[in-house]
Swiss-Prot record:
<dbReference type="Pfam" id="PF00172">
    <property type="entry name" value="Zn_clus"/>
</dbReference>
<dbReference type="GO" id="GO:0008270">
    <property type="term" value="F:zinc ion binding"/>
</dbReference>
<keyword id="KW-0862">Zinc</keyword>
<comment type="function">
    <text>Transcription factor that regulates the expression of the gene cluster that mediates the biosynthesis of ustiloxin B, an antimitotic tetrapeptide.</text>
</comment>
<keyword id="KW-0238">DNA-binding</keyword>
<keyword id="KW-0479">Metal-binding</keyword>
<dbReference type="InterPro" id="IPR036864">
    <property type="entry name" value="Zn2-C6_fun-type_DNA-bd_sf"/>
</dbReference>
<dbReference type="GO" id="GO:0009893">
    <property type="term" value="P:positive regulation of metabolic process"/>
</dbReference>
<keyword id="KW-0804">Transcription</keyword>
<dbReference type="Pfam" id="PF11951">
    <property type="entry name" value="Fungal_trans_2"/>
</dbReference>
<protein>
    <recommendedName>
        <fullName>ustiloxin B cluster transcription factor ustR</fullName>
    </recommendedName>
</protein>
<dbReference type="GO" id="GO:0005634">
    <property type="term" value="C:nucleus"/>
</dbReference>
<feature type="DNA-binding region" description="Zn(2)-C6 fungal-type">
    <location>
        <begin position="11"/>
        <end position="38"/>
    </location>
</feature>
<dbReference type="GO" id="GO:0000981">
    <property type="term" value="F:DNA-binding transcription factor activity, RNA polymerase II-specific"/>
</dbReference>
<keyword id="KW-0805">Transcription regulation</keyword>
<dbReference type="InterPro" id="IPR021858">
    <property type="entry name" value="Fun_TF"/>
</dbReference>
<dbReference type="GO" id="GO:0003677">
    <property type="term" value="F:DNA binding"/>
</dbReference>
Length: 588
């Protein structure tokens, strides 16, 4: 076989790069030695399309590999000096495939040679996917001064600067609302905290530029004018965002407190932002690794602040333990608004994704503490379009499933103890449902046309609550649609689905309950779910998300209908089916 031929064995990364793979684990030794992300040996990745997405992934791996080679050859004698500069990228560099020197003077160029650009692929983290820790991110010490911050010049005499301003405005006005369609800060002024973080965090700045460039690319036709140049800009901004985030995370290994950075909770905010960037690029494994890193940063942030003497805390440096609540003392701070927003996005996605993956979130204990705070959970409604308490029974059911599996493995499962735990979770749901049910019934009587945004969020919460009932009893009884509690909860969930106007159904918010209940539907229940899907396929903004969910639900139906008595219910469990189809609901 010639070296130019595509290899048919080995990990997906080596096959893409046409390298010999030793197939000796994940990451394989070849990927580990070159410092690139190992995509493993599982089902064909979503980027493997023999087209543009495959070329983009190859280019991304090439950028990282070349950066590592440059670093190995470098003499680490230079340092960064001078005032912080506006982050910008030299778009005139002749080496289009190598990491660029972004917004740096001649004395700054060594940072791309003395530090690793590999962090965001985190090959070391890939080998311990379900038990990530910040300690395993091994990087060289970053430059001694603070990273560049966005400066607003008085004269726009620079074409590159105008490009960046255009992309930043596109992010604030178009991309952020598209990514977070449930966020209730609908006007640009209500999103002014974004500019604050963009100005103070270079990692957030470059990641936002990358996201903006990505969505611009998605709106351009194949072969459109300027597409190639924009793709190169996207790759360069992304490379810089990875480097800046590497600096940020590596600072956590230093003796000083990891929260004493330029922005409160910066590693949380930027970790979530980069996870979203990887998700829209369909690098789902990398996205989850960064989400896990952000979760650990959040846990570390809260653990550190809880031990500090509140009398010595400065509002500009170290936040108190109430940093994520509605404490009026901090409500007006733009940095705290950003931290609350991205922490909620993190918790929401991490819990639901881990539920789909049948794993326990790395920061589960931190989430439990936050979700027990009645001043914190109301914040979810305005950010994700659903009340935050619905995550409590979901997380508790995940912990129950883990406990049950462990007890069964030991041969020590007590049915009485199992039922006691189930009763506790049901009581959480029951107490909340007593408040929800009358309000939803009034909406049913009033009709769809009279619903306000607050009423829509109430219906979302009601649907989630009944999906949680189904989820809980699936843990106890397996994926069995005939179980009375499962069948009844699906019926009540469907009644609420029909209260939502098709144009207002947000499948980014509702992906989890749709899969939980839709996958277990039988008979007339399926007809109603099919109606929901067909009505929403007319809405092009949700069709790609819905296509993923539709594939999972219909595969579950097919497997259930052709089941045999001795067949395991796992064949029509939506979580198992989603894994086999290589799909994800993370940042869907």
């Amino acid at each position: 076989m010639s070296g130019a031929q595509r290899r048919k064995t080995g990990c997906w990364t080596c096959r893409l790069r046409r390298k010999k793979c030793n197939e000796d684990g994940q990451p394989c030794s070849n990927c580990e030695a070159r410092g690139v992300f190992c995509h493993g040996y599982g089902p064909k990745p979503s980027w493997k399309d023999r087209g543009e997405r495959e070329r983009e992934e190859a280019q991304r791996l090439q950028l990282i590999s070349r950066a590592r080679t440059r670093r190995a050859r470098a003499t680490p004698t230079n340092s960064i000096n001078g005032e912080p500069r506006r982050p910008s990228i030299d778009m005139n560099t002749s080496d289009m495939g190598s990491p660029i020197q972004m917004g740096l003077g001649s004395s700054d160029s060594s940072i791309f040679e003395t530090s690793s650009l590999d962090l965001l692929d985190i090959p070391e983290l890939g080998s311990s996917l379900w038990e990530p820790t910040l300690d395993i991110i091994q990087v060289q010490p970053p430059p001694s001064d603070a990273p560049s911050a966005l400066q607003f010049p008085s004269i726009l005499g620079d074409g590159l600067e105008e490009k960046e301003i255009d992309l930043i405005m596109y992010y604030v006005v178009e991309v952020f609302p598209r990514q977070h369609s449930s966020y209730q800060g609908t006007s640009v002024m209500e999103r002014s905290w974004l500019l604050c973080v963009l100005k103070r965090s270079s990692s957030f700045y470059y990641t936002s530029l990358s996201l903006s460039a990505h969505y611009r690319l998605m709106s351009m036709p194949e072969g459109g004018q300027g597409r190639t140049a924009l793709l190169q800009e996207y790759e360069r901004y992304k490379t810089c965002s990875l480097f800046r985030f590497q600096e940020l995370v590596s600072s956590a290994t230093r003796p000083q407190s990891p929260i004493s950075t330029g922005v409160v909770g910066e590693s949380v905010i930027c970790g979530v932002q980069i996870a979203m960037l990887e998700a829209v690029s369909k690098n789902m494994q990398s996205s989850y690794l960064h989400l896990s890193s952000a979760a650990l940063s959040l846990a570390q942030l809260l653990d550190n602040t809880s031990t500090l003497d509140s009398s010595s805390i400065s509002t500009n440096t170290t936040p108190p333990s109430s940093v994520l609540t509605t404490d009026l003392y901090h409500a007006g701070s733009m940095e705290y608004k950003a931290l609350r927003c991205f922490s909620i996005i993190l918790i929401w996605n991490d819990i639901l994704h881990c539920s789909a993956q049948q794993t326990i979130p790395a920061a589960a204990k931190t989430y439990q503490k936050l979700l027990a705070d009645e001043s914190f959970i109301p914040l979810f409604a305005d950010i994700v379009g659903c009340e935050g308490w619905v995550l409590v029974p979901i997380l508790e059911a995940m912990l129950l499933a883990s406990w049950k599996k462990d007890q069964e493995a030991k041969g020590q499962l007590s049915i009485r103890e199992l039922l006691t735990k189930v009763d506790h979770i049901e009581s959480i749901l029951g107490d909340r449902m007593k408040r929800l049910a009358p309000a939803v019934l009034r909406q049913k009587e009033a009709g769809i046309s009279s619903q306000s945004p607050e009423q829509i969020r109430l219906v979302h919460t009601y649907i989630f609550a009944h999906a949680s009932f189904v989820h809980l009893h699936t843990v106890v009884s397996g994926a069995q649609p005939s179980v009375p509690e499962i069948r009844q909860s699906i019926d009540k969930s469907l009644a609420a689905w029909q209260l939502l106007p098709p144009s207002l159904i947000n499948f980014k918010t509702m992906a989890w309950p749709f899969c939980v209940c839709g996958s277990m539907a039988v008979g007339s229940q399926r007809e109603l779910f099919q109606k929901i899907m067909s009505e929403n396929f007319q809405n092009q903004s949700t069709s790609s998300n819905l296509h993923c969910l539709k594939s999972v639900v219909e595969e579950c139906w097919k497997n259930f209908d052709k089941r045999v008595p001795e067949q395991s219910p796992s064949s029509y469990n939506w979580k198992v089916v989603m894994e086999k189809l290589n799909l994800s609901i993370l940042f869907i």
